[in-house]
Amino acid sequence: HGKKPSAEFKKVHALVQKSHDECVKKVRIGMTGIEGDKLCRHIIEKAGYGKYFIHPTGHSLGMKIHEGPYISQIEKEKLKENNVFTIEPGIYLPDKFGVRIEDTVVLTKSGAKILTK
């Protein structure tokens, strides 16, 4: 609320951004939702914040705002060409702050294309 971001906030924000960018760069047709989720989650876990990433990495969009295949730790369905889904890793530190970075992507033969700005 008008304060400069703390060093911890900057660190967490950069980590979430790195996690997001890695998933956008590496997600591919034929991966399961589990594999897509791991692209984000392993970066956050490796940095020691895994227990603060408390939601799935993303969800598909269609007739409903949240639908499968999900980009989650339990989604076995494979991603297909032209699937539209979110990539939205986040870290939530209790009584401090939370950071989530979200984009909607379409999965093409060459990878994820960001649709949001």
Predicted regions and their residues:
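Active-site neighborhoods and metal-handling regions in enzymes and metal-associated proteins
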Residues: H1-K117
